[in-house]
Amino acid sequence: MSRPPPTGKMPGAPEAVSGDGAGASRQRKLEALIRDPRSPINVESLLDGLNSLVLDLDFPALRKNKNIDNFLNRYEKIVKKIRGLQMKAEDYDVVKVIGRGAFGEVQLVRHKASQKVYAMKLLSKFEMIKRSDSAFFWEERDIMAFANSPWVVQLFCAFQDDKYLYMVMEYMPGGDLVNLMSNYDVPEKWAKFYTAEVVLALDAIHSMGLIHRDVKPDNMLLDKHGHLKLADFGTCMKMDETGMVHCDTAVGTPDYISPEVLKSQGGDGYYGRECDWWSVGVFLFEMLVGDTPFYADSLVGTYSKIMDHKNSLCFPEDAEISKHAKNLICAFLTDREVRLGRNGVEEIKQHPFFKNDQWNWDNIRETAAPVVPELSSDIDSSNFDDIEDDKGDVETFPIPKAFVGNQLPFIGFTYYRENLLLSDSPSCKENDSIQIRKNEESQEIQKKLYTLEEHLSTEIQAKEELEQKCKSVNTRLEKVAKELEEEIALRKNVESALRQLEREKALLQHKNAEYQRKADHEADKKRNLENDVNSLKDQLEDLKKRNQNSQISTEKVNQLQRQLDETNALLRTESDTAARLRKTQAESSKQIQQLESNNRDLQDKNCLLETAKLKLEKDFINLQSVLESERRDRTHGSEIINDLQGRISGLEEDLKNGKILLTKVEMEKRQLQERFTDLEKEKNNMEIDMTYQLKVIQQSLEQEEAEHKATKARLADKNKIYESIEEAKSEAMKEMEKKLLEERTLKQKVENLLLEAEKRCSILDCDLKQSQQKINELLKQKDVLNEDVRNLTLKIEQETQKRCLTQNDLKMQTQQVNTLKMSEKQLKQENNHLMEMKMSLEKQNAELRKERQDADGQMKELQDQLEAEQYFSTLYKTQVRELKEECEEKTKLCKELQQKKQELQDERDSLAAQLEITLTKADSEQLARSIAEEQYSDLEKEKIMKELEIKEMMARHKQELTEKDTTIASLEETNRTLTSDVANLANEKEELNNKLKDAQEQLSRLKDEEISAAAIKAQFEKQLLTERTLKTQAVNKLAEIMNRKEPVKRGNDTDMRRKEKENRKLHMELKSEREKLTQQMIKYQKELNEMQAQIAEESQIRIELQMTLDSKDSDIEQLRSQLQALHIGLDSSSIGSGPGDAEADDGFPESRLEGWLSLPVRNNTKKFGWVKKYVIVSSKKILFYDSEQDKEQSNPYMVLDIDKLFHVRPVTQTDVYRADAKEIPRIFQILYANEGESKKEQEFPVEPVGEKSNCICHKGHEFIPTLYHFPTNCEACMKPLWHMFKPPPALECRRCHIKCHKDHMDKKEEIIAPCKVYYDISSAKNLLLLANSTEEQQKWVSRLVKKIPKKPPAPDPFARSSPRTSMKIQQNQSIRRPSRQLAANKPS
């Protein structure tokens, strides 16, 4: 073979690498790819590739291949060196483990070199390869590495070894939002802040083209300032061009997953970013309520609720959630087609829920967070849960026999935020040279700056020396000015005190006149009443003469005599009480009408009850259900009446508040007008002061500069010529400067005087404007008064017409009253007869109660004997029937009474309506008169106030004149003192004198202007006086029209008075009848409540007795089985063999089983845990005891019918996925019909304030503590239950909505009636039970399965279809905290 010549080029090599432009550009592109951290072939990826190849090939079986062995021999040592130089886990000290998941854990670490604290996430390569889920970490790494967003947790570096992937992240010491929600009750203000931050964080993720898909409080971390950042991006997915995602698996946490993501499980996975907004809605609901909206104990239950979200989403009644918050949650938790945020984040930002005064969407990150974590050090981990050490062995890859490539999926994972590799490239060198040039230029600039600063410092020193000289002169002037100011302040204080006294005097005089006017008015009223009394006396005498012999006349005389006594008593009282009585009369008539309507409703309902009782005599249970429905109706009617009363009182309060607000608004309007004028004055003063100060500063600066230059020039010349006389010259210069300063002060004072004069001119202008405005207001008032006079004349004409109509109405009323009296007497007799009947029935009832007590005594004595107990139960049933018959008789009597009362009430209603019309007309006349009088008094008060204001203006004017005189005198004195000092500066003195003359001329001009202004002021005062006189004339005219009487015939007046008297008499009779009626109603209501309480107590006693019976049955059954066992033992030949077949392996017979089991407290094991019960299973019943002592006393807590059992089975993780994993093998479930359960009434303790559910159970009620700020009454004692500012503690039942004082419960008073609303009892229930071990669980399940009846239990004749046939199982739910389980398909 021929060799190539030595000088020749290699074949295929580039001809000139340095000279070829195309080759250089390709190399630059290649370098750019290697330097780019996002490139798949960057430096770290290439090193990872080499490292992973060596790790995957370095096994004995693979080294047999010669090529692999040569490769390893070549690169094995260098790869080990690379590993030593790269970052590794040993570079960090582990402080604490703060999280653990399926793929690894999160550690709090400190970097050894920099001593900085980080959170380091470890992911096991073996676990990811084993679960075929090694792709999720790429999205998480890329988002945290390249997001550069304040809403995303930052990744500082990522590295790996043969077992783990490591991600060193920003440490968030505030913990997650789960920790925050467990430590605090989150108010709506906080929820608003954190929801806004989550919205912005998700918007940042969406803007990167990704969907998070696992938004939950566990993935929301808080930094040291309390602000939120998102974490855990393992479930993130890239959106396509249309903003959608295709996925065939449901990804996310069950409680927060959206319906469209759930549907993707079946292969229909096509959804967008709106799935994240669903999770935000769930998160907001959880913050405000304390639980997720679709919580269920099983996964199936949770998913079914999410799919049926339209029906299953509901807000608890006891949670305080605003309308805007509810609206936002509903907008998020809806179908994806209409979900809020589908069209962009802007529509979420514009929602009214986020409106507040503290932050906006741009500065929320800069504002203070609601909770800032208190940290003791940089490694404080108090906001994270303590995690136990993982003692299990770490699994690793097995030694392969062929090439597997376990490390290949992780090539390119390594990342450094501050990458120092390839930093010495040519581009870097160019950057360095540019930096050196910049540094040189900056040094030159700094030198120039230094020289300029030195020059500045010398200039400043010279300026400071001059300022010190000025200060010494200013201090003297300030002392004199202070003394003057003190004297002026004293004088002003004395004058203001005098003005205040004058104002108080004028107001007292006005009040005195007002009281005198009211006294005259009262005297007139008294005279009118005396006239009425005299007329009544005359009528009495006439009646005595006409009807001396008849009995009817004597009754009327007595009534008239009573009326006379009442009117004499009324004369002694004040007129104000009469007006109040009329108002209260109108209000009471309205209340009576309402009570009467209530009584009618109650009568109708009583009729319905009677018919229902007659129909349902066959069965006691059916009778109870009808009674319950009637009670519900009755409570509903009483609630409506209470609501109406509350509304009426609320409206009255609103009227009063409206009037108060009107007066306040008028006062504020006046104050604002005064304030506006004051502000205008201040504005003018400020503008003048500012202009003057600017001028003074400019002039002083110019003068100082000129003087400085002149002094410098003089000093230079004199230093050259006169070196020997420097000291003398310097002293002379100082004196000259002093004199100059004194002259400047004089100049400034003159200019100050000018400014003050200008200020006064502007103040006078403002006063002029004010007075003009007042004149305009007075003219407007005059027009308004004229219109009022016209309106009043029209009203008077209308009132005369109304009087004629009322006279006709009164005639008709007198006829109707006579007929009513007759019917009333008959009704009273019938009512007395019925009351006697009722008393006899009550006596019979008491006798029956005694008999029941005797029967109870017999029951206690005969508890040991079964036959006696059965006999007692039959006896009890007969007593119940007898009580029913008595109840029916009572209801018949009540019905007859109520029918008669209703007829009376209809007649009274018509009379009351007519009376109200007449009273309202009289009230309107009195109101019109009182309004006119009040207007007159207000006008007089305004007059006095304006006179006082004019006096104050005059006083101020005088004060200003005196101040001007004093300033002129002081100026003249200073001028005289200064003339002696300014002898050497004659030229400057002449100039100053000229300026002083000009100033004096200006002062004289100002004085002339002031005189002219005073003249104008006097003219305006005259105009004011004329307007006032016109106003008083108009008021007098109005009073004249009001007091004018129209000529009316005397006969009509007497008829009117007579009818008014009769009207009053009838009204008094009505009032007494109504009082009697209300007393009877209260009495009947109390009796009803007592009956209801008695029925409730008796039903509870019956349940308890039945439970004790069941327990006794089980004891008897046990004794019988023992007896049988003994008989069998005696009959058998082998004495030592024992019962044998009769007993099971565990020592109990097949028909009996007992032991300790745990029940969930309030059906929520996560929040309240379990409670132990002693359980006995007999042939017919399952009995639950609180303790073995209760078992001995036959006092069970709960009893279940074995006939009503449907199903018994061990649970799975999906059934109780919130329970502890260790407890699941020991839990089993019983499914039974609700009618087969009998249970003791439990009084749960009131929960603390921190918890959301504070329900108190009592007599079937579910009371919730509350406060009422609007009118409401207690339905137990009928006393007020509200107050505007400090309402008393109250309770409201969330079933029947009855309201009462909390004191009745605390004092254990028996006033509260039992609840009238009960839940449906014919629905299936499930019960979870926890055994002590898995063996016990299996034993209980196997035994109970044998007990289940083969045929379904016969349904109750009056109940609905059994749940066993419908297979609809209602799962009990309660308030709980959702479990925080780490998802199995991603790290925590």
Swiss-Prot record:
Residues 497-573 form the REM-1 domain. The modification Phosphoserine is found at residues 1137, 1362, 1374. The record marks 1131-1132 as: Cleavage. The modification Phosphotyrosine is found at residue 722. Residues 1362-1376 have a biased composition (Polar residues). It is a peripheral membrane protein. Residues 1-24, 512-532, 1345-1388 are annotated as: Disordered. InterPro entries: AGC-kinase_C (IPR000961), C1-like_sf (IPR046349), HR1_rho-bd (IPR011072), Kinase-like_dom_sf (IPR011009), PE/DAG-bd (IPR002219), PH-like_dom_sf (IPR011993), PH_domain (IPR001849), Prot_kinase_dom (IPR000719). Residues 92-354 form the Protein kinase domain. Residues 1054-1126 form a coiled coil. Activated by RHOA binding. Its cofactor is Mg(2+). Its EC number is 2.7.11.1. It catalyses: L-seryl-[protein] + ATP = O-phospho-L-seryl-[protein] + ADP + H(+); L-threonyl-[protein] + ATP = O-phospho-L-threonyl-[protein] + ADP + H(+). The modification Phosphothreonine is found at residues 414, 1212. The keyword Nucleus applies. The active site is at residue 214. A zinc finger (Phorbol-ester/DAG-type) spans 1260-1315. An interaction between Thr-414 and Asp-48 is essential for kinase activity and dimerization. Protein kinase which is a key regulator of actin cytoskeleton and cell polarity. Involved in regulation of smooth muscle contraction, actin cytoskeleton organization, stress fiber and focal adhesion formation, neurite retraction, cell adhesion and motility via phosphorylation of ADD1, BRCA2, CNN1, EZR, DPYSL2, EP300, MSN, MYL9/MLC2, NPM1, RDX, PPP1R12A and VIM. Phosphorylates SORL1 and IRF4. Acts as a negative regulator of VEGF-induced angiogenic endothelial cell activation. Positively regulates the activation of p42/MAPK1-p44/MAPK3 and of p90RSK/RPS6KA1 during myogenic differentiation. Homodimer. Interacts with IRS1. Interacts with RAF1. Interacts with RHOA (activated by GTP), RHOB and RHOC. Interacts with PPP1R12A. Interacts with EP300. Interacts with CHORDC1. Interacts with BRCA2. Interacts with NPM1; this interaction enhances ROCK2 activity. Interacts with SORL1. Interacts with PJVK. Belongs to the protein kinase superfamily. AGC Ser/Thr protein kinase family. This is Rho-associated protein kinase 2. It comes from Sus scrofa (Pig). The lineage of its organism: Eukaryota, Metazoa, Chordata, Craniata, Vertebrata. The gene is ROCK2.
